């Protein structure tokens, strides 16, 4: 296999991260230095993000038959890297509490980031499976990094077992597809499917459904959602900002790429499965979030409904594909920014108070002590609810347009009911922050966070929150950016 110069340039962002992984391993082996490894990891992620600019002129390009890089995949890779940067920034002050094994956190984050990136550009079932495993395996360690807390160990063990079951479904589906079609290329699958007999089509369809079931588990969709709340509760907040975003962006991007060749509209079985899962995920996620008192569990159920909205984008005809990609980019950017803010805030206060601030009632009266931070959290919650002048409203408006254009009336009903239920849940959190503080709130312990905006975590939270407002009021730059990557 010979890789030419152009392909080498296309691999530059990934080679930078691979080189960083090697340096981090050597540094851990010979001379541990937490600050150096954290700084090196963040800088390498930023350099890798900037190097994506050089790919714009040479894409689309194939790197062997395993990977296919497009402008659209560059957009999703950018989001994944930004999520990784946020995770490393949030994790540094949190890891200072640990006497040992701080540096391995950044190694696991880099490896998982590489897996998510490779999944985004996968063009073959073999690279897809390896990328999913490369992305998932380090997450087991990240979830259990607070090994002194039983909830973290329990969450890691649950995710390990259930992820193994998910991987077995993925491998079964891939094997079934290959046994019938003799080809594992995502690009050729639709053509192969159309050339098969009806009985062979049913068997390939079974394999595709197995693959989708594995992805739905990773996306925590109903009915594969039962692990979500427990694992969100047990996972450290700094890890959640990565766990909740990068994998879901990568998996959604590969689903969007797959269905660009294998139209959902052309197969009633796939269309029905996606419709039902989207319908119940929206309703169940928003309904269960209302009854939560733990803020991590709340956002766990909220993520189920948010990805349920996102699945609607896949239920379009080929004529609407361009608009669905545009909508997906807007919605995922909103999802990225909101996750960075609210998990960043939880991490910020947990570090300041030396205990987990994960109960909703602990945030009562936050506005009267930290008005700017409470205002940013308010913007985030309103954006998740789809209130005007936020980016979330624009994303939901585009999804509602897809529902109308494609006559998805049943999904539309769940969309409206889910939005109302979601608004109730988000407004409950907002009102809680503006009430008078109670004795149970952590207001007395918050003094150390008075200068939160001067910290790297605070700057990241502030920028992400303000972006939701600016792009909600003036979304044209974002629309032009997404249109340019089509």
UniProtKB/Swiss-Prot annotation:
Keywords: Cell membrane, Membrane, NAD, Quinone, Translocase, Transmembrane, Transmembrane helix, Transport, Ubiquinone. GO terms for molecular function: NADH dehydrogenase (ubiquinone) activity; NADH:ubiquinone reductase (non-electrogenic) activity; quinone binding. Its EC number is 7.1.1.-. It is found in: Cell membrane. Its main location: membrane. The keyword tRNA-binding does not apply. Pfam families: Proton_antipo_M. Coiled coil: none annotated. GO terms for cellular component: plasma membrane. The chain crosses the membrane at residues 8-28, 36-56, 74-94, 104-124, 125-145, 160-180, 204-224, 239-259, 270-290, 298-318, 329-349, 374-394, 407-427, 459-479. HAMAP family: NDH1_NuoN_1 (MF_00445). NDH-1 shuttles electrons from NADH, via FMN and iron-sulfur (Fe-S) centers, to quinones in the respiratory chain. The immediate electron acceptor for the enzyme in this species is believed to be ubiquinone. Couples the redox reaction to proton translocation (for every two electrons transferred, four hydrogen ions are translocated across the cytoplasmic membrane), and thus conserves the redox energy in a proton gradient. NDH-1 is composed of 13 different subunits. Subunits NuoA, H, J, K, L, M, N constitute the membrane sector of the complex. This is NADH-quinone oxidoreductase subunit N. It comes from Buchnera aphidicola subsp. Schizaphis graminum (strain Sg).
